A protein has these predicted regions:
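N-terminal active-site beta-alpha-beta segment that forms phosphate/nucleotide-binding
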Residues: 2-4, 9, 13-129
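Active-site beta-strand/loop microenvironment that shapes enzyme catalytic pockets
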Residues: 30, 130-162
Length: 162
């Protein structure tokens, strides 16, 4: 039999349990959808999204742009590095211990190395300067610019610093 205080505790935590479950379900659905995409579909979607990014004033005015390395059929933004290398400085994240990450400069000819989780990263030193535009991966975004990521919190912690 549950005591009154235990019932009160359960009621207080139920919304958080529901939110956690919904986030997990959204992440699973997103991963499932991305897994069934063909390479051609990923390439076409990436091309369309890159074109839209290039049209924005934010991108056009940015001198330093942070990207991400695409995994599991995420939108591939690497063509921006190829197209604008020398005109803009591009950064990619590198994972660190304690669920932290830093960013490093990448050029079109940079040879990437596998990072902590097998995701390619630049082997260069950490970039410490100003970042004008940060493009992040995400499962979902809302109109208030909140994002649902993959659940590790790397980008959340990183973005708090900017």
């Amino acid at each position: 039999m549950l005591f009154e205080s235990q019932i009160r505790d359960l009621k207080m935590h139920l919304p958080w349990v529901r939110v956690r479950y919904e986030k997990t379900a959204l992440r699973a659905l997103d991963e499932q959808k991305r897994r069934i995409m063909t390479p051609e579909e990923v390439k076409e979607a990436s091309h369309e999204i890159v074109a839209r990014i290039e049209e924005t004033q934010h991108f056009q005015n940015a001198k330093v742009v942070m990207l991400y390395y695409p995994i599991l059929n995420e939108v591939d933004l690497r063509s921006l590095v190829t197209r604008y290398d020398g005109e803009k400085t591009f950064l990619l994240p590198a994972t660190l211990p304690r669920h932290e990450m830093e960013v490093r400069v990448v050029h079109k000819d940079t040879k990437l190395v596998k990072g902590r989780y097998g995701v390619p990263e630049p082997p260069t030193e950490a970039y410490k300067g100003k970042i004008d535009l940060i493009l992040v991966p995400g499962v979902a975004f809302d109109k208030n610019l909140y994002r649902l990521g993959r659940g590790g919190g790397y980008y959340d912690r990183f973005l708090r610093r900017y």
